[in-house]
């Protein structure tokens, strides 16, 4: 990727319950991480979200999770490597089928919530996720968190021939190791649109952020995430899009 891509977790409503402002966000993003039914989403929501992404020319990514609808996929759970691969294949395959029925396709994979965090904390789980992507389609990139040092993850991706897209967050606070501050702690999520915009621009320029302890943190990222369930992020997303386009000369 030659420029920083803007991605958003999206399609996270289900049944009569609505979350996020998908239609408002979609025109300004490059990549839509669409929930696949295990933490949020359902077949109808998936179909509608795919149609919205295709209408806006947005790349579609599968956003698989632990099977935890009640906990929104944010609770860590114990799975074997084989079970992790089963979860991924089931969810990616479901979204891919819905995409193909509308003339689209899944273009990358980004795990959600606790699956994402556990993947970053446990090398064996990261290996299982990369193996699952490679087995399903080795041409699909895997989106994962950019940290102070991406080299270990990159080596695993290279081992299985899977492209890695390293992701930074515009609306989350970081600790000094380059990990996201737990949502259980105060200040973990930025709720001011100007703060979100400034963090996005800092990352896009390749400049160091201020970690939660005040230390400088430099992240090497390919893509930037904003959350569609954070009203402040939605308020900032158009300004972020305009700033990224200006930086890229678009």
UniProtKB/Swiss-Prot annotation:
**Which pairs of Cys residues are joined through disulfide bonds in the record?**
none
- Print the keywords alphabetically: ATP-binding, Hydrolase, Nucleotide-binding
Reactions this protein catalyses: 5-oxo-L-proline + ATP + 2 H2O = L-glutamate + ADP + phosphate + H(+)
- InterPro entries for this protein: Glyco_hydro/deAcase_b/a-brl, LamB/YcsF/PxpA-like
Kindly state a single biological-process term from the GO annotations of this entry: carbohydrate metabolic process
In terms of Gene3D superfamilies, this protein maps to: Glycoside hydrolase/deacetylase
- The highest taxon in the source lineage is Bacteria
Name the Pfam families on file.
LamB_YcsF (PF03746)
EC number from the UniProt entry: 3.5.2.9
| The keyword Disulfide bond appears for this protein | no
Enumerate the GO terms in the molecular function aspect. Answer: 5-oxoprolinase (ATP-hydrolyzing) activity; ATP binding
Q: Which residues form a coiled coil?
A: none
First-level EC class = hydrolase
Function, as annotated, reads: Catalyzes the cleavage of 5-oxoproline to form L-glutamate coupled to the hydrolysis of ATP to ADP and inorganic phosphate.
The annotated subunit structure for this chain is: Forms a complex composed of PxpA, PxpB and PxpC.
By sequence similarity, the record places it as follows: Belongs to the LamB/PxpA family.
Q: By what name is this protein known?
A: 5-oxoprolinase subunit A
């Amino acid at each position: 990727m030659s420029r920083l891509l803007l991605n958003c977790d999206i399609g996270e409503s289900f049944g009569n319950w609505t979350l996020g402002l998908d239609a408002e966000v979609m025109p300004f993003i490059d990549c839509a991480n669409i929930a696949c039914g295990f933490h949020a989403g359902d077949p109808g929501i998936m179909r509608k979200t795919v149609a919205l992404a295709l209408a806006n020319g947005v790349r579609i990514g599968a956003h698989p999770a632990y099977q935890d609808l009640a906990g929104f996929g944010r609770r860590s759970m114990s799975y074997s490597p084989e079970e992790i691969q089963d979860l991924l294949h089931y969810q990616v395959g479901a979204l891919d089928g819905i995409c193909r029925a509308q003339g689209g396709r899944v273009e990358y994979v980004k795990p959600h919530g606790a699956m994402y965090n556990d993947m970053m904390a446990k090398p064996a789980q990261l290996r299982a996720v990369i193996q699952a992507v490679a087995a399903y389609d080795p041409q699909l990139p895997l989106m994962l968190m950019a940290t102070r040092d991406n080299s270990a993850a990159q080596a695993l991706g290279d081992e299985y021939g899977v492209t890695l897209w390293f992701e930074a967050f515009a609306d989350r606070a970081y600790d000094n190791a380059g990990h996201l501050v737990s949502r259980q702690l105060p200040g973990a999520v930025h709720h001011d649109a100007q703060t979100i915009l400034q963090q996005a621009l800092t990352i896009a320029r390749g400049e160091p952020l201020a970690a939660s302890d005040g230390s400088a943190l430099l992240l090497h990222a390919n893509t930037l995430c904003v959350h569609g369930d954070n009203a402040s992020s939605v308020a900032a997303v158009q300004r972020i899009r305009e700033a990224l386009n200006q930086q890229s000369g678009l």
